Regions:
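Cytosolic C-terminal regulatory domains/tails of membrane transporters and channels
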Residues: 432-520
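Transmembrane helical cores of multi-pass secondary ion antiporters/exchangers
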Residues: 1-433, 511
């Protein structure tokens, strides 16, 4: 009964946070929920500790469905286009952070062994996907930066967790085999992705099979979709792969609705979107409330320790945060410079073939600004805390390590909440932009009405529904014509046609078939 009451208390807290978020829009909802979690810790005491007795339980219960939904909603083409940069951040940067934090913490605090310091660095490697999404809402971040941050947060959990496990094993046994570690890492990384893709394809096959039998049941499809991440995580984990990566891979290939349109498809999309919106909001809130409830437990012992001053502890936290920021900034800056150099060479080659002026290269200041946004826009969060709380009691300076990790979580969340919007402020929209937003809102409303009408269509109302839907489509067409809105394929074709006309005119001028004045 007490556990049930605690669950109700957390749900009520999430509900309250949604109201407070509207009253205090400048403070991100994760920080509000963490603050409310701190208050719950005083009321609930140690009861919530049961959720963190086993980090795998936390991962499968909360992180798995959230990552599955994030991957399902992610823009696959952007992720694939930026795959090299995402893998660089999710694997290379995590390893760089492990090495930098490990050696620095061991040198700064000799009582923490090198292996334990590496474990701390591994726990601090992953970014929090929920906090990343929250930080992106309050800042004007470029599409590429958003894609990189989201893609990184989907993958780097696995690399950080695997590295953490090896570091803890080395700290406990005093032995470390690089060959064994690399083999295990490849098994978990590649195996997790492979298992996720296979299970995702199997899930799609099951849905298509049920659909082929004529069982167009919305309840079955939505429940099957919600059920999928838990099964994928547990199956991949039992097979030796990374459950986190398996869930992400399954989400990326998840296609629960068919490509053809129809009333049943519209109904399925509406229900699925609504269900996932509620699940995502609730789990996101509970995750950060739980994070708030765990901070006092993780930090109280070290904070009250008379053997080390509180000022020294704060200096340790700020120094480690600075190391993390510096390593991440340098890595991202170099990555962006290399990326834009390749893009510039490709553009120059294409411009030379078409005999047009190439686009100017991105400046160092531009890349430094983007790197600063991406550096502070990747805060640490629940995965870091869930992993660091599993450090065995036998590890020397365990409480100090917990304190340092929790302190860095708070610092990075504060920076993401208050500094990123300053670096990338949302642009003030003029009347033209407001008008465009209003027009787009009208179009969205009309499309939703069409989808709802199709979802509620019955055999008796089919003919009438088609007439009304045709009228709404005509309204959409008129609004587009009045406001000069074109669909993306038409726009691309028009731009391509203009490019051909310009190139043809330039050739006529160069061959003196027409004079320069007439050509231009």
């Amino acid at each position: 009964m007490e556990t049930f009451l605690l669950i109700l208390l957390m749900l009520a807290t999430v509900l309250a946070s949604s109201v407070i978020d509207q009253l205090v829009p400048k403070v991100s909802s994760p920080l509000i929920q963490i603050g409310l979690g701190l208050a719950i810790a005083v009321v609930a005491g140690r009861q919530i500790d049961l959720l963190f007795d086993e980090s795998k339980l936390f991962l499968v219960l909360f992180i798995a469905p959230l990552l599955f939904h994030e991957a399902k909603e992610a823009k696959k083409t952007e992720l694939w286009r930026n795959r090299r940069s995402i893998l660089s951040l999710a694997i290379g940067l995590v390893l760089a952070i492990i090495v930098a934090v490990g050696f620095f913490v061991n040198a700064m605090i000799p009582s923490i062994s090198l292996a334990a310091a590496f474990a701390l660095g591994a726990a601090l490697g992953p970014t929090d996907p929920i906090a990343v999404s929250a930080a992106s809402k309050d800042a004007d971040i470029s599409p590429r930066c958003k894609s990189l941050l989201k893609g990184e947060s989907l993958i780097n959990d696995a690399s950080g967790i695997v590295a953490f496990q090896f570091a803890i094993a080395a700290a406990m046994t005093g032995a470390f085999s690089p060959a064994h570690a690399i083999g295990e890492f490849l098994l978990e990384f590649v195996g997790g992705i492979a298992f996720g893709l296979i299970l995702g394809v199997i899930g799609n096959g099951i849905v298509r099979l049920v659909r082929s039998w004529g069982l167009e049941n919305t309840t079955f499809h939505v429940l099957f979709e919600v059920f999928t991440p838990f099964i994928v995580f547990l199956a991949a984990d039992q097979l030796g792969g990374s459950g986190i990566l398996a869930v992400v891979a399954a989400g990326l290939v998840n296609v629960i609705s068919p490509r053809t349109a129809g009333p049943s498809v519209s109904r399925l999309n509406i229900v699925s979107t609504s269900v996932w919106r509620v699940i995502s909001f609730t789990l996101n809130g509970i995750v950060f409330v739980l994070l708030g409830t765990q901070l006092p437990r993780a930090m109280q012992t070290t904070w009250s320790n008379v053997a080390i001053s509180n000022w020294t502890l704060l200096i340790y936290v700020l120094t480690i945060s600075l190391i993390l920021i510096a390593v991440r900034f340098v890595w991202v800056l170099l990555m962006e410079r290399v990326h834009h150099r390749h893009v510039a060479k490709r553009n120059e080659k294409a411009a030379k073939e078409k005999n047009i002026a190439p686009e100017p290269r991105k400046s160092l200041a531009h890349d430094a600004h983007s790197a600063a946004i991406m550096t502070l826009g990747g805060p640490k969060g629940t995965v870091t805390l869930a992993v660091i709380l599993t450090i065995p009691q036998a590890i020397a300076q365990r409480q100090l390590i917990l304190f340092l990790a929790c302190g860095v979580i708070v610092v990075t969340l504060l920076l993401a909440t208050f500094v990123v919007p300053i670096l990338a402020p949302q642009k003030k929209r003029d009347n033209t932009e407001q008008l465009e937003r209003d027009v787009q809102a009208n179009l969205d409303i009309l499309r939703i009405v069409i989808e709802e009408l199709s979802a509620r269509q019955t055999p008796e109302t089919r003919a009438a529904t088609r007439i009304v839907v045709r009228q709404y489509n005509d309204r959409i067409k008129r609004i587009k014509e009045l406001n000069g809105i074109e669909d993306e394929p038409n726009m691309k074709l028009r731009l391509r046609t203009l490019a051909w006309e310009r190139e043809f005119a330039r050739n006529l001028i160069e061959t003196d078939e027409v004079d320069r004045f007439a050509g231009y």
